Amino acid sequence: MIIQKIEFNDKKDKFVIETDTKESFLLSYNDFEKFKIHNEMIIDDELYAHLLNISKFGEAFDISLNFLSYKLRTEKEIITKLKSKKFSTEIIDDVITKLKNLDLLDDYNYAKIFINDKINLTNYSKRRIINDLYQKGIDKKIYEDYLEEVFGYNMELDKATLIVETKINIWKEKYEGYELKNKIFTFLLQKGFSYDVAKQISGMY
């Protein structure tokens, strides 16, 4: 295999290498210099496989950086994104490792920010927060100590109270007595609030 054409792609900030077999791959300036790439250079199968792997890693890493540029992501979200682009497991693992080493990917930090946002901006129950983080691929063990520290029983009680207050006038027109209590109790359970919270709030009506 012989290198027949070398161009620099300004948009991607990388060299585009083409061979006599119509294969092509991208290399950063550092890798281009490291391997002393030049026209008419003969590349054996082993070197080509290595350069192609470097090219694929660079492509996957660039996609991840762009994906992260919009907002914080979880490890699962990055993996799902790269899998959708058909990258190998080896490449994906290497990208995840590099992102973590650069402090660009941290599920614990993501969970803390997510929890704080939901506490300050919503009336989500603790269970709702846990379920949402689970959907994002973050195991409860990663953040459970922090969640327990910042989201206690009284806070959940307050949030449940606020939610019920937005509904109670409508419900009172339809229900009374046991039916009203049951409506409140069931509603709060469906929203992810604990049995104790649901029982205490419904007992107030």
Swiss-Prot record:
Transmembrane feature ranges: none
Superkingdom assignment: Bacteria
Pfam families for the chain: RecX_HTH1 (PF21982), RecX_HTH2 (PF02631), RecX_HTH3 (PF21981)
A Gene Ontology BP annotation from the UniProt entry: regulation of DNA repair
GO cellular component, one term: cytoplasm
Subcellular location: Cytoplasm
Entry-linked InterPro entries: RecX_HTH_1st, RecX_HTH_2nd, RecX_HTH_3rd, Regulatory_RecX, WH-like_DNA-bd_sf
Main location: cytoplasm
Keywords: Cytoplasm
Signal peptide coordinates: none
Role according to the record: Modulates RecA activity.
Family in the record: Belongs to the RecX family.
UniProt-recorded name of the protein: Regulatory protein RecX
Organism of origin: Finegoldia magna (strain ATCC 29328 / DSM 20472 / WAL 2508) (Peptostreptococcus magnus)
Gene that this polypeptide is encoded by: recX
